[in-house]
């Protein structure tokens, strides 16, 4: 099978070098590998799709050798909040989720959590069924689907953003079960914790192993801390679609930054958050407290133009996706771009940023075997150059 690589013109000079044949056994040499929180001149052996060894290694008989040409060798990225990519949207069913899986791998993503949006219960169930199908029968050469992230319907109307207001409802496990109907793929849920019944839902979902997050919410800081007491562990797209930070009422962002139990998701596209805000949040929470996300819609990886999100027209201009009203409607961000932006725009050290796109999001949803270059981990390696441009993927 030909392992095609995705390029956006940033590093066409590497294209020929990394148009590789998929091999069962491969040794990656001459790269600066991100291992145990630091960059090392280390070789990486991949066998049967998994990292087998890391260190100063000699080739085995018949083993394919790939020269990383001095590039940074990173763990494959983990995106825990992504609606769509390359014209495919997880709300449209199994075929689109499979297209997302194969396409995202070419951008360096090793694993992702397809994220639903507000819809009627049957539509939500249909979308979850498509995600479940790919969880149960993964793509042979695609990014792993870790489960579903339900970003609706238990949201506050005031902060709905691009969500469909008519599909929002009060939190209850009865409503949740009506949408899920026994499916086992749900891994995350975003809700507004100040709504009546939300704390009970958070506690119940924790018992089922579902990670809960706060966003599209009018919560005050006290509501977030109470939700964390009940089991909430993340803030979705920090500062966006939530109460603002104020010095006398810190709101959702202030509580999320202050509470060490909470991981904050950030969209590092320079549109949703100013670089100074990215820097402040990154320095406040550190590598283990930030999960970089794309929150991308179907225009990610495609040119500017008109697209769709939940039946709404979305206009993408200069990479910014907005409804006709001007409201932001997801992003067109790719994970490797988020890494570059955190380093080059926000000025956060690479050693701090890499975990934010790899091990921290993986750990935050209990995804073992992703986010690190270590024996047993997924054998997906993202390559970036000294200017933090994406150079290719080895998988």
Where do the language-model regions lie?
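Short, positively charged and aromatic/hydrophobic N-terminal segments
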Residues: 4-7, 13-17
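Histidine-rich, glycine-flanked metal-binding segment
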Residues: 7, 20-74
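Acidic, glycine-enriched loop/beta-strand segments at the rims
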Residues: 33-43, 288-289, 346-354, 363-395
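Metal-associated gating/positioning segment near the N- to mid-region
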Residues: 71-126
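Conserved, mostly hydrophobic/aromatic
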Residues: 150, 205, 235, 342, ...
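Short acidic/histidine-rich active-site segments
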Residues: 288-310, 315-332, 375-376
